[in-house]
């Protein structure tokens, strides 16, 4: 659902991509994790009817590892993290001197900015904490905007370092 939800739609008796001109990116290891052998905890998040049409349409690019310049014309690179789920991609876009990071389920809401505040769905919570700490520190140092997909009030935030750790700069 939210890992790929909205990317496909039913058209008659087929499920097809909603955006026929879009390009989709996924790490090979995450694709295998989601399609070949999803674990019982995550199986409901990786609905094959949402995933396979993207591959079948030829719109999906699978890649290995963190990638700089996955889509250079958009200034896009992808950071891979392993705490929430195996090789989850965090898209990072540089445009007109600004950088924005799609925090995905690593930092889904403003309430999840403090490092110990995690999602209950994380498959490796201690790894999530390490990854989140490193990525948030880097975001502060590089003045990166953070886009949070699940926060209805704070879609894009600026972060700052405080005595309690990284927090919102409000």
Predicted regions, residues:
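Short, well-ordered secondary-structure micro-motifs
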Residues: 35-38, 73, 91, 113-114, ...
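Metallo-beta-lactamase
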Residues: 1-2, 9-11, 15-80, 130-143
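Cap/insert and terminal regions of metallo-dependent hydrolase folds
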Residues: 5, 13, 88, 96-170
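A broadly conserved detector of short glycine/acidic/proline-rich loop/turn motifs that flank catalytic sites
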Residues: 30, 66, 82, 95, ...
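Active-site-proximal beta-strand elements of phosphoester/diester hydrolases
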Residues: 76-82, 100-105
């Amino acid at each position: 659902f939210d890992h790929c939800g909205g990317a496909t739609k039913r058209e008659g008796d087929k499920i097809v991509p909603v955006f026929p001109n879009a390009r989709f990116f996924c790490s090979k290891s995450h694709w295998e994790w989601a399609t070949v052998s999803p674990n019982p905890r995550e199986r409901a998040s990786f609905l094959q009817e949402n995933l396979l049409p993207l591959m079948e349409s030829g719109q999906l690019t699978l890649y290995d590892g963190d990638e700089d310049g996955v889509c250079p014309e958009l200034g896009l690179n992808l950071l891979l993290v392993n705490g929430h789920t195996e090789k989850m991609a965090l898209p990072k876009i540089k445009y007109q001197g600004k950088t924005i990071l799609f925090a995905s389920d690593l930092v889904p809401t403003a309430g999840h900015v403090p490092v110990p505040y995690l999602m209950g769905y994380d498959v490796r919570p201690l790894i999530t904490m390490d990854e989140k700490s490193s990525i948030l520190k880097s975001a502060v140092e590089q003045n990166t905007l953070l886009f949070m997909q699940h926060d209805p009030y704070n879609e894009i935030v600026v972060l700052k370092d405080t005595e309690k750790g990284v927090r919102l700069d409000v």
